[in-house]
Amino acid sequence: MLEYNYNGVTLDYIGDAVIELAIREALILSGITDTGRLSAAAQKFVCAPTQSNVVEKLLPILTPEEEAAYKLGRNHRISGKPKHASVAEYSRATGMEAIFGYLHLTGNHERIRNLIQTAYSDMMEEMKDKI
């Protein structure tokens, strides 16, 4: 059960920003300094199909509260059809964003760093090889 009564849309909204900032920071720290390359790389990390794939790494290690946030985000009604993802991918991606929104709003910043590392470590390694 969630400690706070946020709705899925609210958790998705803030979680999107949390993930975006964490990815941008990680890319800069990896040595990419050109803003065009940073934007292109960040987009690959935060698009719905990618988030849908990487959240699968997180599901087995989520706490009950994180899992509740995931389900809350994943299950909220989608208005319209997502442009660059299937409805299932979009739902899983918004569920992932809800996890990070929940963690941010409850002050669990170390857990955010750990889950970002777990979710994106393979992609970060590939990115480092291209620098």
Language-model-detected regions and their locations in the chain:
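Double-stranded RNA-binding/processing signature
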Residues: 1-131
